Amino acid sequence: ARGLMNQWIAYGSEWYITPILNARLMHIDDFPAPIPRGANSVIDNHYHVGTRDFYRQIWWKDMLEIGSRRKIIYSGFIIIDYNHAVRKGLMNRISDLTLKDLSLNGRELFLDEGELGVHGYNHNPLLYDSKDVDFASLNYKPWGTQEDMAAGIEQVNKYVEELFGKNVKLYTYVPPSNMLRKEGLEMLVKHYPDLKAVSSIFYGTDSGGVYIQEVGRNKEFPSIYNLPRFSSGFYYDEDEIWGIFNAFAVYGYWSHFMHPDDLISKDRSRNKSWVELKDEFEKVVVTVEEKLPFLEPMRAVDMTKRYINIEDLKITSEKKGNDIHIALTDFREPFKALIRINSKKIKNISSGSFKEIYTAGNSKIYLLSIEKEDITIHLGD
């Protein structure tokens, strides 16, 4: 309800200005990843093709088509292999077919202007054994030592360079099952030299190893930023939609994630076919578009740069007559902001640009493009 409270405060003020990231992110966890072989009953019943053919020829094609229609930029988070090798000496060479799948999907992601981030060497979260984490029920194995974790991370670095070359940098990490603790963060910072952001989840309960995040620089590991996701899945859900708008009202961005295997998981698919789910997924995107059409689609790394740009920004403002004077401290580069104005409207602005995006009674909200340290907004009736 923080978003509601934030807007309630704004509504009660003569004017209220806040910087926003103005970004729309779409994460695909477990992509690229090894594609399951053989048949799956959910897929076979509807499409009569093998699992690998379905994901290569149908699912990914549909995702690209939706992305083209809705101007989505995907950030994919790679898994090298679905094994339980959580000890340094057990990490064997992956198969040529797995290498082919990773290469094809990764290169198609790049061709679609997407970003490659890290999900893991395998899908075992970077956690030590702990009584409060039920590894057995989750079908996970705890890591033995930091040396073992480091070996897994270096496997990712090795395969990414082999598949895509030295110029591909890994800026963003998504923890498997959104589970992560200090021991894992230490290894991430040490062994991913280009890492800038960790993206887990914003809503949820911080228990059982789940990594719940607030937006901002990580206080223990200040070289990385916490930029959580606010929604997930392919299905349309009113509670998820509320969560999206509530988070936007505070932070000014939308970050959503899904997994390719959501559609063959009974709970994550809600027993719906891919034909139904792809329509519901697009409905989610359209719903957000209709309310927030100004959000800019981008890669995860690009939003991280936007956050870095405004993290130290301080805004002061005062009103004299029909002018609002805004002064910025620690201004670096142009950024977006929202301003709510009650009982007046903007006539013009001394620099940058403005666009009215919402009206309710005597209150108007504008999207500002702020380009200088000091600006004046001229109001009228």
In which residue ranges do the predicted regions lie?
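Non-catalytic propeptide/linker segments at domain boundaries
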Residues: 1-42, 56, 60, 91-92, ...
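His/Asp/Glu-enriched short active-site or ligand-binding loop at hydrolase and phosphoryl-transfer sites
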Residues: 189-235
